[in-house]
Amino acid sequence: MTEFYVDNLSYALGSVKRTVDESAKSDTFSSAKLLRDSGFETHHLAAEGESVLDLAVKAVGPIRGSLTELHAIIWASCIPENATVGDRVQFERSRDVKPLMDFPASRLQSHLDAPQAIVLGLVQQACTSMLGSVRVACGLLTTEGDFENILCLTSDCFPSGAKYEQSYSLISDGAACCVVSRKPEGYRILACHQITNGAAVQASDEETAAVYFTYMNRIVNETLAKAKMT
């Protein structure tokens, strides 16, 4: 069986650093005490004008030297509007949809000078989109015999005015990336697995917390079984 590996992990956070107390004044649902008791201390937000593309460029910076032979870039977005850096005002003015298809993954490909790399976008998987990109990368390496290195990247900023909290977790703006390849370096991927419950797409925070441990127990056991581990 072909083996795949994850290596060259890197990340970047929004340029504005706050304390939990500062963010809890207006940008969270929970109190500062509850967030601190949950383990949160600092909060990072994108600066004004700092885009998901900017964060992505910052994230790949430390591993730039390892990205010289990319065959694919998979950009994973949690929030759908982060899948484009296009100008909606320009679209409304011109009524041409082209500005809405100004994809950050294509811009990142150009920034990395990787014209040989195909570009894919992944969305509608929320906070597990990065894990989904790794699974897609393994699929590409399986079917495309000439592919060797695939950059998986996720980058998200909350929209202006949003509360930076989901399911009692404080969320920062940021980006993260890794390279999935056949080279036996970094971490070997033993198995990929996921569970999708489409009926729970708009579940409340309370409902999400209620089913979390049930699903975690199930998915951990199913993943271990798939990897033939106990």
Which residues does each predicted region cover?
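Conserved beta-strand elements of the Class I
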Residues: 5-7, 71-74, 149-151
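Conserved catalytic cysteine-centered active-site region
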Residues: 28, 32-53, 80-148
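Phosphate/pyrophosphate-binding loops at sites that engage ATP/ADP/AMP, CoA/4′-phosphopantetheine
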Residues: 58-71, 218-230
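Active-site glycine-rich loop that binds ribose-phosphate moieties when present
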Residues: 132, 136-139, 152-175, 218
